[in-house]
Amino acid sequence: MKSKQPQPDGQSYRTAILRYAERDQAMRQQYLVGGGAWDASLDADSTDFLRTTVAAIGWPTIRMVGSEASTAAWLLLQHSPDIDFMEHCLELMKAAPRGEVALRDIAFLEDRVCLLRGRPQIYGSQFQGRGKTLRLYPVEDAERLDERRAAMGLPPFAEYEKQIRQMYGDEPPAAR
């Protein structure tokens, strides 16, 4: 009789997800500030890991792996080169019980998927460029943007834009 290998528990997945996210962020940080090499294979490797994880346990929810690791899984997914997998995970995230996936993570991923599919974003989370060239990608129904953002627990767009412009070296026009 063959013995079955025990399934890893949430803590095992949490540890692995956080390790992959740490690698992801270290590479990006070195690239941005230190002129390190961009390693696209890291995103592919992280996607393979996440694909295996999702096949085994579904989307890594807050209850299963904790808030930090659930958001770290989202971060890895944001950097995935596989848009179909991103869309699949977005549906899993939306289907999770309320409070099991951060609404912010869902909103940002939905905007990323819209952008990659050539559609206007819904929550206004995605910008392009840096400094004076920083601009918001097109947004669907801009008049109701803050209403949609509030429903996902996001700050008003003007506040978010100011934060983004401060991070990337440019103040919004009203602050000049």
Put a short name on every predicted segment.
Residues M1-G118, I122:
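N-terminal helix-rich structural modules
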Residues R112, Y123, K132-G169:
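Amphipathic alpha-helical packing elements
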Residues Q7-D9, V139, F157, P173-A174:
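Generic low-complexity segments that are intrinsically disordered, proline-rich and/or Lys/Arg-biased
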Residues F127:
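Expand to "…catalyze enediolate/carbanion chemistry for C-C bond making/breaking, isomerization
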Residues Y168, P173-R176:
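Extended hydrophobic packing segments that form well-structured cores
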